[in-house]
């Protein structure tokens, strides 16, 4: 080098002009002054100044001496560093320094000076910046690449720059630092791990949070050098992740944080690292997998991340972790879902399936977080979540765990409020989530008080927010009510009813507290507190808190007065809110932030505060209805047809008239209702009448102008209106007018005189009107009514068949096809029953005569005159009317006493009628009477006969009714411990003697030792005993055993001297005993009480007689399988294994498709007629239900079981059997002239047989709205469905001869459904409910028709009858009708129909709970289950000619 030569030749240092020598001999100030001049000189020099470069070479060398590099003064060091930086610039590309050590010292010196950049306020900062700019621009540090210690230099430089960068620096400082550092990475041969660490450490979250500028600097550097640094980053991760060499760097423990940061900075940095993560996702180390999952959740979920589309294998591998065995990993995956849904809607499809499985996870926290994730995304934008995802939230509203259910319900409520009420995303979004309102209200059918309270809270805050202005609130309620489905409406009605009931309970409590303290009042207060407690969560704590609250009410008059205002019927919504605020304020304690006592009282106040309805609200609601009537409302905008809105508005007002009658007392309200009465829409006028009936008690006194306008309308309605309006008009007059006797007389007289049996169309309304007058004012018209019944009702109507019925093979037709004459006869029967119920006595023997008449109708299969004029559908209607009438009369004690055992047993056979609808409606009426504790206990025994029903859904319905009735009685006994004298009529176990007696007298049970008949008896007994024995409360198994033993010591009171009858009784007892012994392990213990047997049914036990004989044939032993009975209320396990997915909800239409009349009765050789029940072992059913549904009534549990429980194991269906004759000659009708009529027209030996097996449609007059919608579809198939035999008698379908085992298999196995109570308003007219109930059968009729080969059909026929009857309508055996020709065992042909068992059961393998409410009705119409026959054998049944049948 040239300088070197000079250096060697000449050691003299040349200073710039004006600068004297710089040495240690001068002062610091002077040195600084001289150095500044040197800096200026070097600053002005450029690389081309060769002379100056030569001139100042020695100065350059001198400035790099240790004297300067180690000078104590920072100003000196800074100036020297600036000079050195310029020297590197001027002399580039060669530096004047050749010694590697010297170079290292110089660069380490410059690096140290860069620390001065830290203080941006320093007067020297600009000079520090100049230094940085200079070395960055010249890339001076690149000289170090050739040095051995270069790594140390670079590392120190990087550390220095990262440590000094701060928010005081401008963009230029940042840029120069990046330039300086990036040149080292991009132009160097390698990047050491140490150097890499100095960069990456700034990305670690802890450092990142400490120094955001260092993070930004590192980020900018990595972006700039991505391509160059990527191999070194890859190597680092490879060493740590794949080879496990964590010692190579202190950052090894932060690899996953670093990967995330690097991915966010530039995904190219990790091109080779991401495949390594796929490997790590499959690691055996739980914690390691968890770390990777957390990392990838952030990477996939980041807003602009394209990782899922760029790296599909990694995405799929990640999705697999949703099913990881480690709970925290699944939890992490689920939490990630919401970010992913919000930031990447395109991935929702991939996530849906995995979230579906996780929504059924065994871990509560995971199910909970699935809901949170979906709801969070939905609240951001409803379009982010598809219907499947929302459906997962819907399913979880039935979860086993309260926390999960609560989250799901609240989530749906928030979504509903945002998108349906506030229309945050337009009408399409509102339609998408329209189902939420129904679903939330359906939850009110749950047993849990927590669920029901939450529904009430949701309703008040999210569905109809109580803080809305009155008009807006009522508009919201009006359109909500108009768009709810039937079950949601019932739930909402039930909610108001429960709140109203609780309000009255609290009012009663306040009245009791105000009374003077006595032992009686203290007991009454305690009793009332217990009742209120049952309406609050956590009854144990609630009881203590309610006692405390009672004490507060006694002591604090202010709180008591506030509460009195709150429960007053005149309390306004604003007042209610004020009262609640005041009471909670007084009870609160600022020092106690969490106050469980206050929380409980808040629950109570929330339930009783009328926050929606007051007089102003009713007025606003009426105005809203009037707007719809006038056509000025926004009905169409709200998506509700005007007619539907008006009808729903009136229905809503009708319900509120039960719960808030005082709120209707305004002239404006009554005037609007009067206008509604005059409308053409029958339903609207009907509702208006009911509202008047409920609210009109003060009309006479307070609103005389309304009274005078209303009276003529009521008169007109009662004389010429539709039947239901006539009924309500009579009840209105009874409720409103003090001169009711006069009014009734003005109506009764003209109607009575104008009754004309030849004018059938105009008879129905008068009969309904007279019937209700007779019910409400029996004494006023006692004589004319008796004469009317004896002459007109019985002689002219019931004993006359004026017109021949249409010839049809159907067993049931819709209302409009029923002959007018039959409709009149049905009303005539109802009128007689109302007359008797009004009288409430049998002094004139009218009850006895009526019962004989009704049983004669049953005996004659509905054809009272037996002239053969009445069509089969009409006969079905009359049988149903007669059976229902007996059940109605049995609810009145004076008539129950006169119903003979033979009449009771005959009535019981209606539950096995051949027509599906007769069985269905009769069962509902029976259930209604039993569940209200109105029917005596022996009527519950009738349910046992349902075990013989060929249609599985009927058996399921009967079972649920039985469970509900048993629970109702048990609950009643718990709450009324003092009613021990009524134990015999209430204790469910006492149904066993009645059941045994009924089965012993079953006309199907003919041969005492017949195995097949005994197997039927066993099935019927087990149908009842299984539910009774599900819990061995108070040692009930031993009690039942003792009862059965006691019966064997008695004789049948119905025929004490009939040896065969008594033998049957003892045989049935032995069947029961064997069931008890095979299913119970505690039956042999001592019975807690000595049972009392009903004296009407059994003689007194003979103490001298010990009946230890076993009456069962030995072959029966094999039919009693040991094992505990299944519990009736099963709350299944929370979930299936991890891979399971929930079962699809069953649609309304799918459940409506049931077995039809044609398939179940009309053709014995058709598959539906001969279905047996599946052995429960064949049903591979999941019990994995999450939560039961039940009646909304508190404390009344319902049954929830899978189909295998409902379908009891049975090999064969019963054969037709001989019937016990009834001596009709001995029965007299009681009215002299009537006796002859009945006996003349009743052929000798006329008998009634039990018939069996149809599904079909139903009456329209009192039809549920949704059933009407279904009717049109159903009726299309009527011709095929309802074709019974021409001369077929009702009875159970014959068994397959030769011991075949037909089976039935459900096509879709619904999950267990809770029975639901009809949740109408409190105490509606029983008549009204009854009429409505008769309208619930139409929907249940559609079914698959199975083809049977003609050849098989012909084989099933007897040669002697085939010529007489068409092959299309083969009769089933009449019950008890002996066939003249014996039925030998003939060869039979098996026809296989339907799927294999495996196919049917496969659907159920992953069964979760179904949306129990979808399309289901309350307990009065328990949900239907679709059935399909799997394996069917054709049966050989002897046909008989008409003569032989009628012998």
Curated annotation (Swiss-Prot):
Comp. bias regions, Polar residues: 1137-1155, 1355-1372
Organism of origin: Homo sapiens
Record family assignment: Belongs to the PDS5 family.
Induction note: By the synthetic androgen R1881 in prostate carcinoma cells undergoing proliferative arrest. Maximum levels occur 18-20 hours after androgen exposure.
DNA-binding region(s) from the entry: 1249-1261, 1287-1299, 1372-1384
SUPFAM superfamilies: ARM repeat (SSF48371)
Name the record gives this protein: Sister chromatid cohesion protein PDS5 homolog B
Modified residues (Phosphothreonine): 1255, 1367, 1370, 1381
Source lineage: Eukaryota, Metazoa, Chordata, Craniata, Vertebrata
